[in-house]
């Protein structure tokens, strides 16, 4: 006979992989066209001048230059722009 009662099963023990979101190029950094600037879910940051947005809301540079973060507009939205050097 077993001297230990059988342990029950658990419904926990799973977690999703981290998605590596966040700012990839910070303000003042030089970037080349096509460089990813921000990986995000939704529009935490909006695309400014010389910045494009992918279908998953990733912001990327469309021209060479320096990254500039700014808050503007009535709703105080955060914009990311590329300023030509």
Swiss-Prot record:
Molecular function as annotated in GO: structural constituent of ribosome
SUPFAM superfamilies in the record: Ribosomal L27 protein-like
Keyword rRNA-binding applies: no
UniProt keyword Protease present: no
One GO process term, biological-process aspect: translation
Xref: Pfam families: Ribosomal_L27
Keyword terms of this UniProt record: Ribonucleoprotein, Ribosomal protein
Protein family: Belongs to the bacterial ribosomal protein bL27 family.
Protein name, per record: Large ribosomal subunit protein bL27
